[in-house]
């Protein structure tokens, strides 16, 4: 079984990569990975919002079928409490992640994940236990390193099991705080 790494960037156009033909943006590591991977060049979203789109990708259902139709539930207070029935309904649906695990994969969640704990989502390992977009370590993935992913890959190799990695860094979402070396590279004179 092949290992699978799903990379989901936040608020980034499909054209913003070297391997997709951007003339200015350089993405050498992603270009190298793309050259030996399957790249989906014609992807479409089920919703213009993050959360329902991710839920549709996981379940294969439209938002009105899986019940996640917005990023936030209505209500000024107690949003987390009001969101519990939405998450419970979501977890009743099929999921490609649960299918991978049933077929012997180890599955790791890192970065953005809206639907409760990674265990609820069918992942065997993960970073996020709660929160709207993730919290702490989950949102710092990519900005501060990928140690949890490296450890997970080592574990999978030691266990001789195929792996699935959900790598959904909050990048390039705000705050825009690139390393100075990259900022200088793209800064225009004057």
Task: State where each predicted segment sits.
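Formylglycine-dependent sulfatase
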Residues: 1-190
């Amino acid at each position: 079984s092949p290992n699978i790494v799903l990379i989901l960037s936040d608020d980034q156009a499909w054209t913003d990569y070297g391997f997709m033909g951007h003339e200015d943006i350089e993405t050498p590591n992603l270009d190298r990975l793309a050259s030996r991977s399957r790249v989906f060049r014609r992807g479409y979203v089920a919703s213009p919002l993050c959360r329902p789109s991710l839920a549709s990708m996981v379940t294969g259902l439209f938002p009105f079928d899986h019940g996640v139709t917005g990023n936030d539930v209505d209500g000024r207070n107690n949003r987390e409490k009001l969101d519990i029935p939405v998450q419970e309904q979501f977890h009743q649906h099929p999921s490609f992640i649960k299918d991978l695990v049933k077929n012997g994969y180890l599955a790791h969640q890192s970065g953005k994940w809206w639907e409760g704990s990674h265990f609820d989502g069918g992942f065997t390992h993960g970073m996020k236990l709660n929160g709207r977009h993730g919290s702490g370590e989950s949102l710092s993935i990519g900005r501060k390193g990928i140690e949890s992913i490296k450890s997970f890959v080592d574990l999978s190799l030691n266990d001789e099991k195929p792996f699935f990695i959900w790598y959904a860094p909050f990048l390039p979402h705000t705050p825009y705080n690139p390393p100075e070396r990259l900022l200088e590279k793209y800064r225009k004179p004057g």
